[in-house]
Amino acid sequence: RNLMVRSMAELAEQGDYLKIALDRCRHQGIAPGVSLRMNDMHDAPWPDSHHHSHFYRDNPQLHLDSHESFKHEQGRSWGGKGLDYAHQEVREHYLSLIRELAESYDLDVLELDFLRFPYYFDREWSQQDQHCEIMTEFVRQVRQILDSTGRHIDLIPRVASSPGSARQLGFDVQVWARQGIVDGITTGNFTTTSWDLMIEQFRALVGPEIAIYASLEVTADQRDGIANRHIPNNLEMLRGFAAGYYTAGADGVNTFNFFLARNHEPVTAEEFYSGQ
């Protein structure tokens, strides 16, 4: 992780790498976009990690693990240590980040990645309707920020693999579509490619005008009879997943967690750290 921090610092010293990447997309005829992880809790067990913002460190009272429903998961659930969107301060924090992105960068697409990590509220399911209302208002405010730039920026949240799971987490995609506050949605799992995304069910809720994208990830779900581990995707599997998603009515695919593009074995640790 020290290597990661040093690499990030070296990258930042070379200029505004986000602006450079977006400009190159535009130059190459690719619609430039930004994906913002809405509650990323990598390094949750290490409170001094550089992954954690000052806002997160300074406001432990806004963390999800202050709820009883998350306390029993201490040490097991990184997402359970995330920020609680029931607090207006948390929502305002993320809105400020989105405002900076929209006003400072030339982007055509903003993805709100609600799957990394998929925890936003207390696990008190009787409050599900209230959670959905809070998140719908939040997404509406995001839409207003994007529109205030004077140009259209597609808003595409990334949500769970089924409408029921999405709503349980606070994401009422049917209301979002009906109110016209999103341009599309991406459906997927937390870290793996799903064999059975409910694309038809999402389509029935959002209608024909909202684009639906299916998430393709670097690994696939484990299946019955297969060892308890993720299955690495290969080109044939990815083509099969994509064909199935398109047949089910998806408008496109969304690739996630593809760290490299090599058709051979990853480098060894010795090769990696020696820079070979």
Across the structure, where does each feature detected by a protein language model lie?
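Short catalytic/ligand-binding loop motif for oxyanion handling, primarily in non-cytosolic enzymes
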Residues: 40-46, 118-120, 164, 222, ...
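C-terminal EAL-domain catalytic cores of bacterial cyclic di-GMP phosphodiesterases
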Residues: 210-220, 225-226
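Anion (oxyanion) recognition and catalysis
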Residues: 19-22, 26, 147, 206-207, ...
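Substrate-binding cleft of secreted/luminal carbohydrate-active enzymes
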Residues: 184-194, 230-276
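Active-site-adjacent "subsite" loops/lids of carbohydrate-active enzymes
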Residues: 4-23, 27-28, 32-104, 224, ...
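Glycine-rich, histidine-containing beta strand-loop boundary motifs that form or position
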Residues: 34-38, 114, 216, 257
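Active-site neighborhood of glycoside hydrolase catalytic domains
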Residues: 89-212, 237, 242, 250
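Short low-complexity, flexible loop/linker segments enriched in glycine and/or proline
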Residues: 47-57, 124-127, 171, 199-203, ...
